[in-house]
UniProtKB/Swiss-Prot annotation:
GO molecular function term, any single one: porin activity
Keyword terms: Ion transport, Membrane, Mitochondrion, Mitochondrion outer membrane, Porin, Transmembrane, Transmembrane beta strand, Transport
Segments crossing the lipid bilayer: none
Lineage: superkingdom: Eukaryota
Xref: PANTHER family: GH26960P-RELATED, VOLTAGE-DEPENDENT ANION-SELECTIVE CHANNEL
Location of the protein in the cell: Mitochondrion outer membrane
Keyword Transport: yes
Protein name: Mitochondrial outer membrane protein porin
């Protein structure tokens, strides 16, 4: 099994801290269906911070014989998104991807990406074709649960390195640790994740931006499984921001999420948020 990608060195703790909290959108709905020929349709909609609605529809087709995947998407910002993926490109473990986004009479983006995975290596290469162009590469190597990785960004037109970062980690079945130095080694973070029992998970992350602040920002989160179909989560940051959520599988393929957040340092002010999410899959 290949190690995690560089951006996922802290995935377990990041997911615990960030996923399945529903207060950021007052309402969110997504529907996923699969046609008899294997085409997957996904429709998503949610409210945004400025009280507008963000919506998108995607169709994804996979040809297992050739390893070709085509995803076509369209959103209410009138952006047409197309992704073409080809697995086992030239050699086992290598995947190529062309990802484009076009807004009529507006912005255009095109990225050419390559992914390579083997039992102890995970390497990625991203080309932003219309900006720069800029190449970003990252590499992770692993041995006995330990991982080490690095990321490098290079502006081809100016022949300059525009970013670099490094990270290390360790993970087993019950816990994981990770430390990274990003933004040209100016932002440092450390995270841990611990599966205390089959019912309880805890995790925390500390971040220090050596340029912007002398303070260390700390977040802590926990998850408790009520039963096989529901769980609750809570997180708190040193800033006082506290979030709670409840997730319930109503029936196979139907999931309801309820969330709330409040500022523990400003309980008398109207800064609290409520939200819900409803997901359907068939």
């Amino acid at each position: 099994m290949a190690p995690a990608a560089y951006s996922d060195l802290s995935k377990a703790s990041n997911d615990l801290i960030n996923k399945d909290f529903y207060h950021l959108s007052t309402a969110a709905v997504d529907v996923k269906t699969v046609a008899p020929n294997g085409v997957t349709f996904t429709v998503k909609g949610k409210t945004t911070k400025d009280d507008t609605i963000s919506a998108s529809v995607d169709a994804k087709y996979l040809d297992k014989a050739t390893g070709l995947t085509l995803t076509q998407g369209w959103n209410n910002a009138n952006a047409l998104n197309t992704k073409i993926e080809l697995s086992e490109l030239l050699t086992p473990g290598l995947k190529g991807e062309l990802d484009t986004s076009v807004v009529p009479n507006g912005a255009r983006n095109a990225k050419l990406n390559f992914f390579y995975q083997q039992s102890a290596v995970n390497a990625r290469l991203f080309f932003d074709l219309l900006k720069g162009p800029i190449a970003t590469a990252d590499l992770v190597v692993a041995h006995d649960g330990f991982t080490a990785g690095a990321e490098l960004g290079y502006d081809i037109s100016s022949a300059k390195v525009n970013k670099y970062s490094v990270g290390v980690g360790y993970a087993n079945l019950n816990y994981g640790l990770a430390a990274t130095a990003t933004s040209n080694l100016s932002v440092f973070s450390a995270a841990y994740f611990h599966k205390v029992s089959p019912l309880v998970q805890v995790g925390a992350k500390a971040t220090w931006d050596s340029i912007k602040s002398s303070n260390v920002n700390v977040e802590f989160a926990t998850k408790y499984a009520l039963d096989n179909t529901s769980f609750i989560k809570a997180k708190i940051a040193d800033s006082g921001l506290t979030a709670l959520s409840y997730t319930q599988e109503l029936r196979p393929g139907v999931k309801l999420g309820l969330g709330a957040s409040f500022d523990a340092l400003k309980l008398a002010e109207p800064v609290h948020k409520l939200g819900f999410s409803l997901s359907f899959a068939a």
